[in-house]
Amino acid sequence: MEADDHVSLFRFPFKIPTFRGIRKGGVYLSGALYALGFWIFLDAVLYSRYSNASDVHVTFIDWIPFLCSTLGTLIVNSIEKNRLLQGALSSDGGAFGSGVGDLDSSMAWQARTVLFFGFALLAGGLSGSIVVLIIKFLVKDYNTYPTLGMGVNNVLGNVCILLSCVVLWIAQNVEDEYSYSLTL
């Protein structure tokens, strides 16, 4: 038996990618989803500006959910998973701890708070685009495709950005077999 062969429960006719390959693929998939979401929204903006024959156009109100989703993506993906678990893994940390454990717990609390605000911006961006679709297009009876398509593109763009954020978060924080967490 060679050194590269390892015993596994199942045999597949293909090679399973390593965690490094999965991480790289996840980052690329996330970028593709963000680019797709941006292009879908930009398509609606350009259609509204140059080809739209109706009296409804994409305004700054339509941009606000997109900007919230983008800002939420930046905030969520700037937090490391290790920061979230920092206070729980320290041996000195606790409700009445002092010293380094208390500092770790404080940093973990701050990271969780910032992460909450990031996810709140993402959820607000998606729900805001749905509200814009309902109030601006459906309530005012603009339910024909080219005009309604601007609102649908806004929602689809925000969904793609949300999925991009989730894929990037998972890809960045996946544990591979060669990473070690040393705590003293």
From Swiss-Prot:
Gene from which the chain derives: VPS68
More info: Present with 1900 molecules/cell in log phase SD medium.
Glycosylation sites: N52
Membrane topology: Multi-pass membrane protein
InterPro entries, sorted: UPF0220
Function, in words: Involved in vacuolar protein sorting.
Subcellular location: Vacuole membrane; Mitochondrion
Disulphide bonds in the chain: none
Phosphoserine sites (modified residues): S8
Main location: membrane
Gene Ontology terms: cellular component: endosome; fungal-type vacuole membrane; mitochondrion; Vps55/Vps68 complex
Residues found modified as N-acetylmethionine: M1
A GO biological process held by the record: late endosome to vacuole transport via multivesicular body sorting pathway
Transmembrane region(s): 26-46, 56-76, 115-135, 150-170
A Pfam family per the record: UPF0220
This protein's name: Vacuolar protein sorting-associated protein 68
Family per record: Belongs to the UPF0220 family.
Record keywords: Acetylation, Glycoprotein, Membrane, Mitochondrion, Phosphoprotein, Protein transport, Transmembrane, Transmembrane helix, Transport, Vacuole
